[in-house]
Amino acid sequence: MISIILVMIGGGFGAIARSAITDYFNHKFTSKLPIATLIVNLVGSFLIGLTIGLSISISWFPAFFVTGFLGGLTTFSTLAKELTLMMTPKFDINLFLNYSLLQFIIGFIACYIGYHI
């Protein structure tokens, strides 16, 4: 039961952080590329790799930080929505492919780097 509460609390903080980051970048930058989602997913990928690589032995930490906070911070559903919305009558295949590659390949690389630090 305690792990469920830790996931809920961490997830709430992660979602608040994502919302703040999204608001900040949406007001600071105008771009065809959804930069805020890219940033939260890359930071989250790096941090999950770092967390796994450090093998933190605090019993409550994975539930609170990895599943909760990073689960709330990162967002696959928003990525899927953004990729779907790119498929308009003015569909730009290069933007679509570049954004997809940035999310998946650079996300993996960020996780890998975090793991091996």
Curated annotation (Swiss-Prot):
One of its GO terms (molecular function) is metal ion binding. It is found in: Cell membrane. GO terms for cellular component: plasma membrane. HAMAP family: FluC. The chain crosses the membrane at residues 1-21, 46-66, 95-115. It catalyses: fluoride(in) = fluoride(out). Fluoride-specific ion channel. Important for reducing fluoride concentration in the cell, thus reducing its toxicity. Disulfide bonds: none annotated. Na(+) is not transported, but it plays an essential structural role and its presence is essential for fluoride channel function. Belongs to the fluoride channel Fluc/FEX (TC 1.A.43) family. This is Fluoride-specific ion channel FluC 2. Na(+) binds at G71, T74. Keywords: Cell membrane, Ion channel, Ion transport, Membrane, Metal-binding, Sodium, Transmembrane, Transmembrane helix, Transport.
